[in-house]
Curated annotation (Swiss-Prot):
One of its GO terms (molecular function) is monosaccharide transmembrane transporter activity. Its main location: membrane. The chain crosses the membrane at residues 18-38, 82-102, 117-137, 140-160, 167-187, 202-222, 295-315, 321-341, 348-368, 386-406, 426-446, 451-471. It holds the Pfam family Sugar_tr. This is Sugar transport protein MST7. The gene is MST7.
Length: 512
Protein backbone atom coordinates (compact mmCIF):
# COMPACT_ATOMS: atom_id res chain seq x y z
CA UNK A 1 0.00 0.00 0.00
CA UNK A 2 2.95 2.33 -0.47
CA UNK A 3 1.03 4.37 -3.07
CA UNK A 4 -2.11 4.74 -1.00
CA UNK A 5 -1.93 8.45 -1.11
CA UNK A 6 0.80 9.21 -3.52
CA UNK A 7 0.36 10.86 -6.84
CA UNK A 8 2.45 12.25 -9.68
CA UNK A 9 1.21 15.84 -9.46
CA UNK A 10 3.45 18.06 -7.37
CA UNK A 11 1.76 20.28 -4.78
CA UNK A 12 1.99 24.05 -5.07
CA UNK A 13 4.59 25.87 -3.02
CA UNK A 14 3.52 29.38 -2.09
CA UNK A 15 6.08 32.11 -1.38
CA UNK A 16 6.59 33.00 2.26
CA UNK A 17 8.28 31.79 5.39
CA UNK A 18 7.66 30.82 8.96
CA UNK A 19 7.34 34.13 10.84
CA UNK A 20 7.69 34.89 14.53
CA UNK A 21 4.21 36.42 14.37
CA UNK A 22 2.66 33.14 13.18
CA UNK A 23 4.55 31.07 15.75
CA UNK A 24 3.41 33.28 18.64
CA UNK A 25 -0.19 33.39 17.36
CA UNK A 26 -0.27 29.59 17.07
CA UNK A 27 1.31 29.17 20.49
CA UNK A 28 -1.30 31.44 22.10
CA UNK A 29 -4.18 29.78 20.23
CA UNK A 30 -2.93 26.36 21.28
CA UNK A 31 -3.56 27.32 24.90
CA UNK A 32 -7.05 26.06 24.12
CA UNK A 33 -5.51 22.62 24.52
CA UNK A 34 -4.54 23.49 28.10
CA UNK A 35 -8.15 23.62 29.27
CA UNK A 36 -8.95 20.28 27.66
CA UNK A 37 -5.81 18.60 28.98
CA UNK A 38 -6.16 20.04 32.47
CA UNK A 39 -9.64 18.62 32.78
CA UNK A 40 -8.61 15.19 31.49
CA UNK A 41 -5.83 15.05 34.07
CA UNK A 42 -7.64 16.58 37.02
CA UNK A 43 -10.82 14.46 36.96
CA UNK A 44 -9.28 11.06 37.62
CA UNK A 45 -7.07 12.40 40.41
CA UNK A 46 -9.90 14.15 42.21
CA UNK A 47 -12.14 11.08 41.99
CA UNK A 48 -9.43 9.03 43.71
CA UNK A 49 -9.22 11.46 46.68
CA UNK A 50 -10.97 10.15 49.79
CA UNK A 51 -12.31 13.55 51.03
CA UNK A 52 -13.93 14.18 47.63
CA UNK A 53 -15.46 10.70 47.47
CA UNK A 54 -16.74 10.77 51.05
CA UNK A 55 -18.40 14.17 50.50
CA UNK A 56 -20.02 13.66 47.10
CA UNK A 57 -19.97 9.90 46.40
CA UNK A 58 -20.21 8.13 49.78
CA UNK A 59 -21.27 4.80 48.27
CA UNK A 60 -18.04 4.61 46.26
CA UNK A 61 -16.06 5.60 49.34
CA UNK A 62 -17.76 2.82 51.29
CA UNK A 63 -16.90 0.23 48.63
CA UNK A 64 -13.30 1.38 48.61
CA UNK A 65 -12.74 1.60 52.37
CA UNK A 66 -15.36 -0.37 54.21
CA UNK A 67 -16.32 -3.34 52.04
CA UNK A 68 -13.19 -5.44 52.20
CA UNK A 69 -14.36 -8.19 49.84
CA UNK A 70 -15.18 -5.88 46.92
CA UNK A 71 -13.65 -7.06 43.65
CA UNK A 72 -10.79 -4.70 42.74
CA UNK A 73 -12.14 -4.36 39.21
CA UNK A 74 -15.54 -3.15 40.46
CA UNK A 75 -14.92 -0.90 43.44
CA UNK A 76 -15.21 2.37 41.48
CA UNK A 77 -18.25 1.28 39.42
CA UNK A 78 -20.77 4.06 40.19
CA UNK A 79 -23.22 5.80 37.85
CA UNK A 80 -23.12 9.20 39.66
CA UNK A 81 -19.30 9.15 39.69
CA UNK A 82 -19.24 8.26 36.01
CA UNK A 83 -21.70 11.07 35.26
CA UNK A 84 -19.41 13.55 37.01
CA UNK A 85 -16.59 12.63 34.65
CA UNK A 86 -18.52 12.14 31.42
CA UNK A 87 -21.03 15.02 31.61
CA UNK A 88 -18.35 17.39 30.31
CA UNK A 89 -18.02 15.46 27.07
CA UNK A 90 -21.75 15.35 26.43
CA UNK A 91 -21.89 19.13 26.91
CA UNK A 92 -18.91 19.57 24.57
CA UNK A 93 -20.67 17.46 21.94
CA UNK A 94 -23.79 19.65 21.98
CA UNK A 95 -21.79 22.89 22.21
CA UNK A 96 -19.73 22.02 19.15
CA UNK A 97 -22.87 22.14 16.97
CA UNK A 98 -23.47 25.76 17.97
CA UNK A 99 -19.75 26.52 17.83
CA UNK A 100 -19.71 25.57 14.14
CA UNK A 101 -22.10 28.42 13.32
CA UNK A 102 -20.21 30.88 15.52
CA UNK A 103 -16.89 29.87 13.96
CA UNK A 104 -18.28 30.47 10.48
CA UNK A 105 -20.17 33.70 11.23
CA UNK A 106 -17.93 35.43 13.80
CA UNK A 107 -14.57 33.81 13.16
CA UNK A 108 -12.22 31.42 14.92
CA UNK A 109 -10.98 34.08 17.36
CA UNK A 110 -14.40 34.89 18.84
CA UNK A 111 -15.21 31.20 19.26
CA UNK A 112 -12.02 30.66 21.26
CA UNK A 113 -12.76 33.74 23.37
CA UNK A 114 -16.25 32.50 24.22
CA UNK A 115 -14.93 29.03 25.04
CA UNK A 116 -12.31 30.36 27.45
CA UNK A 117 -14.79 32.58 29.29
CA UNK A 118 -17.42 29.84 29.72
CA UNK A 119 -14.75 27.40 30.92
CA UNK A 120 -13.67 29.99 33.50
CA UNK A 121 -17.18 30.17 34.97
CA UNK A 122 -17.35 26.36 35.15
CA UNK A 123 -14.00 26.20 36.97
CA UNK A 124 -15.21 28.65 39.62
CA UNK A 125 -18.41 26.65 40.16
CA UNK A 126 -16.52 23.36 40.53
CA UNK A 127 -14.02 24.79 42.97
CA UNK A 128 -16.83 26.18 45.14
CA UNK A 129 -19.17 23.16 44.81
CA UNK A 130 -21.21 22.15 47.86
CA UNK A 131 -23.31 19.38 46.26
CA UNK A 132 -23.34 17.03 43.27
CA UNK A 133 -25.72 19.27 41.29
CA UNK A 134 -23.27 22.16 41.51
CA UNK A 135 -20.47 19.85 40.41
CA UNK A 136 -22.42 18.66 37.37
CA UNK A 137 -23.47 22.19 36.33
CA UNK A 138 -19.85 23.27 36.56
CA UNK A 139 -18.80 20.28 34.47
CA UNK A 140 -21.38 21.13 31.82
CA UNK A 141 -20.01 24.68 31.55
CA UNK A 142 -16.49 23.26 31.30
CA UNK A 143 -17.76 21.04 28.50
CA UNK A 144 -19.21 23.97 26.58
CA UNK A 145 -15.86 25.74 26.86
CA UNK A 146 -14.02 22.64 25.63
CA UNK A 147 -16.46 22.20 22.74
CA UNK A 148 -15.91 25.77 21.57
CA UNK A 149 -12.12 25.58 21.84
CA UNK A 150 -11.59 22.26 20.06
CA UNK A 151 -13.94 23.40 17.29
CA UNK A 152 -11.96 26.57 16.60
CA UNK A 153 -8.32 25.95 17.58
CA UNK A 154 -7.38 23.19 15.07
CA UNK A 155 -8.94 25.22 12.24
CA UNK A 156 -7.11 28.34 13.37
CA UNK A 157 -3.75 26.56 13.46
CA UNK A 158 -4.20 24.91 10.06
CA UNK A 159 -5.17 28.20 8.42
CA UNK A 160 -2.39 30.29 9.98
CA UNK A 161 0.46 27.86 9.33
CA UNK A 162 2.40 27.65 6.04
CA UNK A 163 1.83 24.26 4.38
CA UNK A 164 5.36 22.96 5.01
CA UNK A 165 5.10 23.72 8.75
CA UNK A 166 1.40 22.96 9.27
CA UNK A 167 1.96 19.61 10.96
CA UNK A 168 4.41 20.96 13.52
CA UNK A 169 2.33 24.03 14.41
CA UNK A 170 -0.93 22.09 14.60
CA UNK A 171 0.59 19.52 16.94
CA UNK A 172 1.35 22.31 19.43
CA UNK A 173 -2.38 22.00 20.27
CA UNK A 174 -1.88 18.37 21.28
CA UNK A 175 1.31 19.34 23.12
CA UNK A 176 -0.70 21.83 25.17
CA UNK A 177 -3.22 19.08 25.97
CA UNK A 178 -0.37 16.97 27.32
CA UNK A 179 1.02 19.93 29.29
CA UNK A 180 -2.43 20.44 30.81
CA UNK A 181 -2.63 16.75 31.76
CA UNK A 182 0.83 16.82 33.32
CA UNK A 183 0.20 19.93 35.40
CA UNK A 184 -3.15 18.54 36.53
CA UNK A 185 -1.46 15.32 37.68
CA UNK A 186 1.22 17.27 39.55
CA UNK A 187 -1.38 19.48 41.21
CA UNK A 188 -3.42 16.44 42.27
CA UNK A 189 -0.32 14.85 43.76
CA UNK A 190 0.33 17.85 46.01
CA UNK A 191 -3.26 18.88 46.81
CA UNK A 192 -3.98 15.33 47.99
CA UNK A 193 -1.54 16.02 50.83
CA UNK A 194 -3.34 19.18 52.05
CA UNK A 195 -4.57 18.72 55.62
CA UNK A 196 -8.27 19.28 56.18
CA UNK A 197 -9.49 17.44 53.08
CA UNK A 198 -10.10 20.49 50.86
CA UNK A 199 -7.30 19.86 48.36
CA UNK A 200 -9.82 18.77 45.75
CA UNK A 201 -11.20 22.34 45.70
CA UNK A 202 -7.77 23.64 44.75
CA UNK A 203 -7.45 21.02 42.00
CA UNK A 204 -10.83 21.86 40.47
CA UNK A 205 -10.57 25.63 41.00
CA UNK A 206 -7.14 25.94 39.39
CA UNK A 207 -8.79 25.08 36.06
CA UNK A 208 -9.45 28.84 36.03
CA UNK A 209 -5.76 29.45 35.25
CA UNK A 210 -5.69 27.90 31.74
CA UNK A 211 -9.14 29.43 31.15
CA UNK A 212 -7.78 32.93 31.86
CA UNK A 213 -4.76 32.27 29.61
CA UNK A 214 -7.03 31.27 26.74
CA UNK A 215 -9.51 34.11 27.28
CA UNK A 216 -6.89 36.87 27.44
CA UNK A 217 -4.87 35.28 24.65
CA UNK A 218 -7.91 35.14 22.35
CA UNK A 219 -8.48 38.88 22.80
CA UNK A 220 -4.95 39.55 21.53
CA UNK A 221 -5.04 37.11 18.59
CA UNK A 222 -5.64 38.11 14.95
CA UNK A 223 -8.16 36.18 12.88
CA UNK A 224 -7.09 34.01 9.95
CA UNK A 225 -7.13 35.24 6.31
CA UNK A 226 -9.49 32.37 5.44
CA UNK A 227 -11.98 33.43 8.10
CA UNK A 228 -11.73 37.11 7.17
CA UNK A 229 -12.36 36.33 3.50
CA UNK A 230 -15.36 34.14 4.26
CA UNK A 231 -16.87 37.10 6.14
CA UNK A 232 -16.28 39.54 3.27
CA UNK A 233 -13.24 41.36 4.72
CA UNK A 234 -11.01 41.18 1.64
CA UNK A 235 -8.61 44.03 2.46
CA UNK A 236 -8.06 42.78 6.01
CA UNK A 237 -7.49 39.27 4.68
CA UNK A 238 -4.88 40.46 2.18
CA UNK A 239 -3.07 42.49 4.87
CA UNK A 240 -3.13 39.58 7.30
CA UNK A 241 -1.83 37.13 4.69
CA UNK A 242 1.13 39.44 3.96
CA UNK A 243 1.86 39.65 7.67
CA UNK A 244 1.72 35.95 8.46
CA UNK A 245 3.72 34.92 5.37
CA UNK A 246 6.34 37.66 5.78
CA UNK A 247 6.31 38.59 2.09
CA UNK A 248 4.57 40.90 -0.37
CA UNK A 249 4.38 38.10 -2.93
CA UNK A 250 1.09 36.59 -1.77
CA UNK A 251 -0.72 36.67 -5.13
CA UNK A 252 -0.97 32.92 -5.88
CA UNK A 253 -2.00 31.95 -2.34
CA UNK A 254 -4.43 34.85 -2.02
CA UNK A 255 -6.05 33.99 -5.36
CA UNK A 256 -6.55 30.39 -4.22
CA UNK A 257 -8.02 31.60 -0.92
CA UNK A 258 -10.42 33.87 -2.80
CA UNK A 259 -11.47 31.00 -5.08
CA UNK A 260 -12.06 28.79 -2.06
CA UNK A 261 -14.01 31.58 -0.36
CA UNK A 262 -16.20 32.07 -3.42
CA UNK A 263 -16.84 28.33 -3.50
CA UNK A 264 -17.93 28.64 0.12
CA UNK A 265 -20.40 31.40 -0.72
CA UNK A 266 -21.87 29.21 -3.45
CA UNK A 267 -22.77 26.66 -0.76
CA UNK A 268 -26.10 27.47 0.88
CA UNK A 269 -26.09 24.61 3.39
CA UNK A 270 -22.62 23.26 4.29
CA UNK A 271 -24.16 20.44 6.34
CA UNK A 272 -26.12 19.13 3.37
CA UNK A 273 -23.14 19.71 1.09
CA UNK A 274 -20.94 17.60 3.35
CA UNK A 275 -23.20 14.63 2.62
CA UNK A 276 -22.68 14.89 -1.16
CA UNK A 277 -20.73 12.14 -2.90
CA UNK A 278 -17.70 14.29 -3.78
CA UNK A 279 -17.05 14.92 -0.07
CA UNK A 280 -17.36 11.25 0.89
CA UNK A 281 -13.66 10.88 1.80
CA UNK A 282 -13.74 13.90 4.11
CA UNK A 283 -17.00 12.76 5.70
CA UNK A 284 -15.67 9.27 6.37
CA UNK A 285 -12.44 10.64 7.85
CA UNK A 286 -14.27 13.22 9.97
CA UNK A 287 -16.32 10.39 11.49
CA UNK A 288 -13.80 7.57 11.77
CA UNK A 289 -10.59 9.34 12.82
CA UNK A 290 -12.02 10.92 16.01
CA UNK A 291 -14.03 7.77 16.74
CA UNK A 292 -11.02 5.50 16.39
CA UNK A 293 -8.89 7.96 18.39
CA UNK A 294 -11.14 7.40 21.39
CA UNK A 295 -11.28 3.64 20.84
CA UNK A 296 -7.54 3.49 21.53
CA UNK A 297 -8.57 3.74 25.18
CA UNK A 298 -6.22 6.66 25.81
CA UNK A 299 -8.66 8.89 27.65
CA UNK A 300 -9.64 6.15 30.08
CA UNK A 301 -5.95 5.72 30.82
CA UNK A 302 -5.37 9.46 31.26
CA UNK A 303 -8.44 10.67 33.14
CA UNK A 304 -8.90 7.44 35.08
CA UNK A 305 -5.16 6.85 35.57
CA UNK A 306 -5.15 7.24 39.39
CA UNK A 307 -8.32 5.13 39.68
CA UNK A 308 -6.84 2.54 37.33
CA UNK A 309 -3.59 2.38 39.27
CA UNK A 310 -5.52 2.06 42.54
CA UNK A 311 -7.56 -0.75 41.00
CA UNK A 312 -4.46 -2.77 40.14
CA UNK A 313 -3.07 -2.44 43.65
CA UNK A 314 -1.17 0.84 43.93
CA UNK A 315 -1.63 2.93 47.07
CA UNK A 316 -3.31 6.34 46.90
CA UNK A 317 -0.13 8.45 46.72
CA UNK A 318 1.60 5.91 44.48
CA UNK A 319 -1.32 5.97 42.05
CA UNK A 320 -1.16 9.76 41.76
CA UNK A 321 2.62 9.66 41.24
CA UNK A 322 2.22 6.99 38.56
CA UNK A 323 -0.25 9.30 36.81
CA UNK A 324 2.39 12.05 36.93
CA UNK A 325 4.88 9.68 35.29
CA UNK A 326 2.48 8.84 32.46
CA UNK A 327 1.75 12.55 32.07
CA UNK A 328 5.47 13.27 31.65
CA UNK A 329 5.81 10.50 29.07
CA UNK A 330 2.75 11.84 27.24
CA UNK A 331 4.20 15.35 27.02
CA UNK A 332 7.75 14.43 25.98
CA UNK A 333 6.59 11.87 23.42
CA UNK A 334 4.51 14.59 21.74
CA UNK A 335 7.78 16.37 20.89
CA UNK A 336 8.69 13.33 18.78
CA UNK A 337 5.63 14.00 16.64
CA UNK A 338 6.44 17.71 16.37
CA UNK A 339 9.95 16.87 15.15
CA UNK A 340 8.96 14.16 12.67
CA UNK A 341 5.46 14.78 11.32
CA UNK A 342 6.54 17.13 8.51
CA UNK A 343 9.60 14.98 7.74
CA UNK A 344 8.24 11.43 7.71
CA UNK A 345 4.57 12.20 7.14
CA UNK A 346 1.31 11.32 8.84
CA UNK A 347 0.91 7.72 7.70
CA UNK A 348 4.25 6.51 9.07
CA UNK A 349 3.47 7.86 12.54
CA UNK A 350 -0.09 6.51 12.47
CA UNK A 351 1.05 3.00 11.54
CA UNK A 352 4.11 2.83 13.83
CA UNK A 353 2.15 4.21 16.78
CA UNK A 354 -0.70 1.80 16.12
CA UNK A 355 1.57 -1.25 16.13
CA UNK A 356 3.24 -0.12 19.36
CA UNK A 357 -0.14 0.42 21.07
CA UNK A 358 -1.34 -3.04 20.01
CA UNK A 359 1.72 -4.69 21.55
CA UNK A 360 1.44 -2.67 24.77
CA UNK A 361 -2.29 -3.35 25.27
CA UNK A 362 -2.00 -7.12 24.82
CA UNK A 363 0.99 -7.33 27.16
CA UNK A 364 -0.83 -5.19 29.76
CA UNK A 365 -3.89 -7.42 29.55
CA UNK A 366 -1.71 -10.49 30.03
CA UNK A 367 0.17 -8.99 33.00
CA UNK A 368 -3.03 -8.06 34.80
CA UNK A 369 -4.68 -11.40 33.94
CA UNK A 370 -1.74 -13.33 35.40
CA UNK A 371 -1.74 -11.31 38.62
CA UNK A 372 -5.45 -10.70 39.25
CA UNK A 373 -7.31 -13.27 37.16
CA UNK A 374 -11.07 -12.69 37.28
CA UNK A 375 -11.32 -12.51 41.07
CA UNK A 376 -9.60 -9.15 41.10
CA UNK A 377 -7.87 -9.84 44.40
CA UNK A 378 -4.09 -9.72 44.68
CA UNK A 379 -1.24 -7.86 46.29
CA UNK A 380 1.03 -6.35 43.68
CA UNK A 381 4.76 -6.22 44.34
CA UNK A 382 6.84 -3.14 43.62
CA UNK A 383 8.69 -4.86 40.79
CA UNK A 384 5.49 -6.04 39.14
CA UNK A 385 3.98 -2.56 39.51
CA UNK A 386 7.00 -1.01 37.77
CA UNK A 387 6.58 -3.40 34.82
CA UNK A 388 2.88 -2.47 34.53
CA UNK A 389 3.71 1.25 34.57
CA UNK A 390 6.43 0.74 31.95
CA UNK A 391 3.99 -0.85 29.51
CA UNK A 392 1.37 1.82 30.20
CA UNK A 393 4.08 4.38 29.38
CA UNK A 394 4.89 2.44 26.19
CA UNK A 395 1.22 2.70 25.21
CA UNK A 396 0.95 6.39 26.15
CA UNK A 397 4.11 7.34 24.24
CA UNK A 398 2.87 5.61 21.09
CA UNK A 399 -0.42 7.48 21.27
CA UNK A 400 1.34 10.77 22.00
CA UNK A 401 3.32 10.77 18.76
CA UNK A 402 0.64 9.24 16.56
CA UNK A 403 -3.12 9.14 17.14
CA UNK A 404 -3.03 11.90 19.76
CA UNK A 405 -1.82 14.82 17.63
CA UNK A 406 -2.70 13.35 14.23
CA UNK A 407 -6.28 12.71 15.31
CA UNK A 408 -6.69 16.50 15.40
CA UNK A 409 -4.22 17.48 12.67
CA UNK A 410 -5.40 15.31 9.78
CA UNK A 411 -9.13 16.14 10.00
CA UNK A 412 -8.40 19.88 10.32
CA UNK A 413 -6.25 19.95 7.16
CA UNK A 414 -8.30 17.83 4.73
CA UNK A 415 -11.48 19.93 4.53
CA UNK A 416 -12.03 22.52 1.76
CA UNK A 417 -13.11 25.93 3.04
CA UNK A 418 -16.74 25.58 1.94
CA UNK A 419 -17.38 22.70 4.37
CA UNK A 420 -14.59 23.31 6.89
CA UNK A 421 -16.61 24.56 9.86
CA UNK A 422 -19.34 21.96 9.39
CA UNK A 423 -16.85 19.13 8.93
CA UNK A 424 -14.78 20.17 11.95
CA UNK A 425 -17.99 20.18 13.95
CA UNK A 426 -18.56 16.56 12.87
CA UNK A 427 -15.03 15.75 14.09
CA UNK A 428 -15.72 17.32 17.48
CA UNK A 429 -19.15 15.70 17.78
CA UNK A 430 -17.82 12.20 17.16
CA UNK A 431 -14.74 12.78 19.31
CA UNK A 432 -16.83 13.99 22.23
CA UNK A 433 -19.59 11.41 21.64
CA UNK A 434 -17.16 8.51 21.91
CA UNK A 435 -15.22 10.16 24.72
CA UNK A 436 -18.54 10.45 26.58
CA UNK A 437 -19.52 6.91 25.66
CA UNK A 438 -16.21 5.38 26.75
CA UNK A 439 -16.09 7.48 29.93
CA UNK A 440 -19.68 6.51 30.73
CA UNK A 441 -19.12 2.77 30.37
CA UNK A 442 -15.43 2.39 31.26
CA UNK A 443 -15.85 1.62 34.96
CA UNK A 444 -18.67 -0.78 34.13
CA UNK A 445 -16.56 -2.41 31.39
CA UNK A 446 -13.64 -2.74 33.80
CA UNK A 447 -15.96 -4.47 36.28
CA UNK A 448 -17.45 -6.80 33.63
CA UNK A 449 -14.53 -7.47 31.26
CA UNK A 450 -11.79 -7.17 33.88
CA UNK A 451 -8.37 -7.68 32.26
CA UNK A 452 -10.18 -8.37 28.97
CA UNK A 453 -10.71 -4.62 28.64
CA UNK A 454 -7.09 -4.25 27.52
CA UNK A 455 -7.57 -6.94 24.89
CA UNK A 456 -10.69 -5.10 23.67
CA UNK A 457 -8.77 -1.86 23.11
CA UNK A 458 -5.90 -3.80 21.53
CA UNK A 459 -8.32 -5.28 19.00
CA UNK A 460 -9.65 -1.79 18.22
CA UNK A 461 -6.10 -0.58 17.57
CA UNK A 462 -5.53 -3.48 15.19
CA UNK A 463 -8.59 -2.41 13.18
CA UNK A 464 -7.66 1.28 13.12
CA UNK A 465 -4.08 0.61 12.01
CA UNK A 466 -5.40 -1.46 9.12
CA UNK A 467 -7.81 1.34 8.21
CA UNK A 468 -4.98 3.89 7.99
CA UNK A 469 -2.82 1.51 5.97
CA UNK A 470 -5.50 1.02 3.33
CA UNK A 471 -7.61 4.19 3.22
CA UNK A 472 -5.67 7.25 4.46
CA UNK A 473 -3.53 9.08 1.88
CA UNK A 474 -0.47 11.11 2.87
CA UNK A 475 -1.22 14.81 3.45
CA UNK A 476 2.29 16.03 4.31
CA UNK A 477 3.22 19.32 2.61
CA UNK A 478 -0.05 19.66 0.66
CA UNK A 479 -1.59 23.18 0.82
CA UNK A 480 -5.10 23.07 2.25
CA UNK A 481 -6.51 24.66 -0.91
CA UNK A 482 -5.07 21.73 -2.95
CA UNK A 483 -6.06 18.91 -0.62
CA UNK A 484 -8.68 17.60 -3.08
CA UNK A 485 -5.86 16.35 -5.30
CA UNK A 486 -4.82 13.58 -2.91
CA UNK A 487 -8.33 12.11 -2.88
CA UNK A 488 -8.54 12.21 -6.67
CA UNK A 489 -5.29 10.21 -6.90
CA UNK A 490 -6.16 7.64 -4.23
CA UNK A 491 -6.92 4.11 -5.45
CA UNK A 492 -10.28 4.00 -3.64
CA UNK A 493 -11.43 7.59 -3.01
CA UNK A 494 -10.88 8.66 -6.64
CA UNK A 495 -14.21 7.09 -7.55
CA UNK A 496 -15.98 9.68 -5.36
CA UNK A 497 -13.92 12.77 -6.16
CA UNK A 498 -13.52 14.60 -9.46
CA UNK A 499 -16.21 16.25 -11.48
CA UNK A 500 -18.16 17.34 -8.43
CA UNK A 501 -15.36 19.53 -7.15
CA UNK A 502 -14.89 21.10 -10.57
CA UNK A 503 -18.58 22.05 -10.61
CA UNK A 504 -18.19 23.89 -7.31
CA UNK A 505 -15.22 25.89 -8.60
CA UNK A 506 -17.14 26.72 -11.78
CA UNK A 507 -20.04 27.99 -9.65
CA UNK A 508 -17.56 30.13 -7.75
CA UNK A 509 -16.11 31.60 -10.95
CA UNK A 510 -19.55 32.68 -12.15
CA UNK A 511 -20.02 34.62 -8.89
CA UNK A 512 -16.77 36.58 -9.24
Amino acid sequence: MENAGAGDGAPKHYPGKMTVFVFIACLVASSGGLIFGYDIGISGGVTSMDPFLSRFFPSVYAKEKEVVDTNQYCKFDSEPLTLFTSSLYLAALIASLFASVITRKLGRKMTMLGGGFIFLIGAVLNGAAVNVAMLIIGRILLGIGVGFSIQAVPLYLSEMAPAKMRGMLNIIFQLMITVGILFANLINYFTDKIAGGWGWRVSLGLAAVPAVIMTVGSILLPDTPNSLLSRGKENEARTMLRRIRGTEDIGPEYDDLVAASEATKAIENPWRTLLERRYRPQLVMSVLIPTLQQLTGINVVMFYAPVLFKTIGFGGTASLMSAVITGLVNMFATFVSIATVDRFGRRVLFIQGGIQMIIAQFILGTLIAVKFGTAGVANISQGYAIVVVLFICLFVSAFAWSWGPLGWLVPSEIFPLEIRSAAQSVVVVFNMAFTFFIAQIFLMMLCRLKFGLFFFFGAMELIMTGFVLVFLPETKGIPIEEMDRIWGEHWYWSRFVGAGRNRVMQMASTNV
